[in-house]
């Protein structure tokens, strides 16, 4: 239950932020260079998940990787935020390489591919063309999902498919993703986002696998929703509800749940 409760807290943070500012936080703020990256959506909602003291230390006009505690060299993003961690994930809470604290929860970029995929060729499926949505990894105006990596901020009015039919957030496994393992404070590329293109719990955790689809360096499959729960993963919907979707969910419907305004009817199991 705690994993679902964490997502509910994130949902309250998203909806309360929208209530104050009239739009949801950006999924990410990936600049045209590292110097122009800015903290993403999980930073924005810190005041709404009882972490206002940490939020006040952030400079929202500076790159995430430049953020340090005053007088130290410790990254603010190395602070473990328990609300952002699923207790079922037994991997370390921080990345041993960069020291950043993980998040098991990422925003939905919709049913379009999130990022170019130059690494780890996929032999079992071409997931970059599997989506109902467009390939639009840098969308700034009106992306397929509620969030994008380029600073787009959706309004409730933009979610014309209905809040109860649209995924806001879901689970990820940072150890299975070369982007998600950069932590909740990162903002580069696909960090902080996932797509409903890829089946729930599609395995991308084996660095030694000959099929690039199944490796964390595959920039497509690693950005799918996945968890340590048996048989599925938890998802936060726009109405604040948390639902467990199974791996056997109809895949076309799953993709449509990622899109905020495709006009397609869905029936949740």
Kindly give the residue locations of the regions a language model identified:
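Short, solvent-exposed loop/turn segments at the edges of secondary structure
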Residues: 38-41, 79-81, 100, 228-230, ...
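Residue-level detector of short, conserved catalytic/binding motifs and their immediate flanks
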Residues: 8, 43, 81-84, 103, ...
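Short, solvent-exposed loop/turn and secondary-structure capping segments
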Residues: 3, 27-29, 57-60, 95-101, ...
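Short, well-ordered junction/capping motifs at the entry into regular secondary structure
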Residues: 20-38, 74, 213-232
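Hydrophobic alpha-helical interface faces used for helix-helix packing
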Residues: 64-67, 90, 103, 108-269
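Extracellular/periplasmic head regions of type IV pilus-like filament subunits
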Residues: 31-88, 152, 162
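Active-site-adjacent helix/loop patches that line small-molecule binding or acyl-intermediate pockets
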Residues: 87-97
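Conserved hydrophobic/amphipathic alpha-helical signal-anchor segments
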Residues: 1-57, 242
């Amino acid at each position: 239950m705690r994993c679902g409760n964490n997502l509910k807290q994130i949902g309250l943070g998203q909806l309360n932020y929208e209530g104050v500012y009239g739009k949801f936080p950006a999924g990410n703020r990936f600049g045209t260079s590292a110097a122009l990256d800015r903290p993403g959506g999980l930073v924005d909602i810190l005041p709404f998940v009882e972490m206002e003291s940490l939020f006040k230390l952030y400079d929202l006009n500076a790159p995430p990787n430049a953020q340090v505690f005053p007088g130290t060299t410790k990254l603010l993003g190395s602070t473990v935020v328990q609300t952002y961690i699923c207790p079922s994930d037994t991997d370390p809470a921080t990345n041993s390489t960069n020291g950043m604290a993980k998040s098991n929860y990422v925003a939905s970029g919709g049913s379009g591919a999130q990022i170019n995929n130059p690494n780890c060729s996929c032999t079992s499926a071409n997931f970059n063309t599997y989506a109902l949505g467009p390939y639009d990894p840098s969308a700034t105006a009106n992306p397929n999902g509620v969030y994008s990596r380029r600073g787009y901020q959706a309004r409730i009015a933009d979610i014309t498919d209905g809040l109860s039919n649209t995924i806001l957030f879901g689970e990820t496994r940072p150890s299975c993703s070369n982007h998600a393992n950069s932590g909740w404070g990162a903002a580069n590329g696909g960090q902080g986002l996932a797509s409903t293109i890829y089946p729930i719990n599609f395995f991308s955790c084996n660095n030694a696998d000959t099929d690039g689809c199944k490796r964390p360096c595959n920039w497509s499959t690693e950005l799918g929703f996945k968890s340590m729960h048996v048989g599925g993963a938890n998802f936060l919907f726009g109405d604040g509800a948390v639902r467990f979707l199974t791996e056997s969910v109809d895949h076309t419907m799953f993709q449509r749940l990622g899109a905020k305004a495709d006009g397609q009817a869905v029936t949740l199991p």
